[in-house]
UniProtKB/Swiss-Prot annotation:
PANTHER family: D-AMINO ACID DEHYDROGENASE, SARCOSINE DEHYDROGENASE-RELATED. It comes from the Bacteria. The lineage of its organism: Bacteria, Pseudomonadati, Pseudomonadota, Gammaproteobacteria, Enterobacterales. SUPFAM superfamilies: FAD-linked reductases, C-terminal domain, FAD/NAD(P)-binding domain. This is D-amino acid dehydrogenase. Belongs to the DadA oxidoreductase family. It comes from Pectobacterium atrosepticum (strain SCRI 1043 / ATCC BAA-672).
Amino acid sequence: MRVVILGSGVVGVSTAWYLAQAGHDVTVIDRQPEPALETSAGNAGQISPGYAAPWAAPGIPLKAIKWMFQRHAPLAIRPDFTTAQLCWMWQMLLNCDARHYKTNKARMVRLAEYSRDCLQQLRRDTGIQYEGRQGGTLQLFRTEQQYDNATRDIAVLEEAGVPYQLLARHELASVEPALANIVGTLTGGLRLPHDETGDCQLFTRQLAAMAAEAGVTFKLGRNVRQLRVEGQSVTGVQCDDEMIVADAYVMACGSYSTGLLRQWFDIPVYPLKGYSLTIPLADDASAPVSTVLDETYKVAITRFDNRIRVGGMAEVVGFNTDLNPKRRETLEMVVRDLYPHCGPIEQATFWTGLRPMTPDGTPLVGRSPLKNLYLNTGHGTLGWTMACGSGKLLADILSDKSPEIEADDLSVSRYTR
């Protein structure tokens, strides 16, 4: 079957790989000249299934109000009063209760755990290299309340069979030695020993090269103008002056998927702006071993081979991609506090990207209201964590194979029931 994939980020390229492995004739289209030049370019680098959780959680509405008056708040909302933003925020608000949180987190962990398994199998099969580490991740708590609240997430981890370690303050340095001098300011941590890290952009480009060798065609530097639809089926993709025709189509354009589909149906995917710093590594002993997550500021600090990636923050500001210097100040503040000697922070590269977020945090993976159009978008802050699993799952659905995990609650139909 001829399949066209719109989007060459980590989700689109992963989907292309698995579809090619299933025997399909695959073409990937993207406006950028190379894969992984937008949201996949500078993310925090962690592959953290156990930490997969929706931003829509109990207490978030009140916290969001408080954060409006804090300099280093992890979430910032700039209302533009557009229908798209207001509807998305209202749907998110409806998911901010314990029942929805438990349901949403459980299915996010399910997909993320499956994705980690798919990544590990891919690594065994191909030997793909992307500065990956399998050292687990450590979530740091600065308050007793955060430590106590961890029990809510632990219950979901136990139900999903995810190994974990709840660490007291004095145990943190045994996992991350460079924290030894500042553990007195922390209350403890939650460690997930099976989590991983790696450079998402490097992975995507390596996988794209392997996909090309396997027969995938990449049409890069092509602007997708619109889908051509007749009846209930897509009949082509208009790219500049070329119409590209296939039997099936996959929408993996992240935050831009919503606009491309609006003429035919709505999907609740909205951009959540994030930031990162990439710092040259100066001292191994002063750097994290793997990934450390600061629960207070929602910032992740990840070790690559010769670099430190500091990523986080969330801004609801539409499609604005300006680099906000205040967000850089927050990222610098966190890394100076936890790892002050890891590298020359003043030499850091500052980056921003738009994560495609659904109100309930769970991506849209599966069929759409159009017969031959499939969705693989809305992964939010977890595109890297969920990419391989989402790609394999979508390939199975498109190929009419039984998915290896439950998939019905991952489709867009959950918003139309």
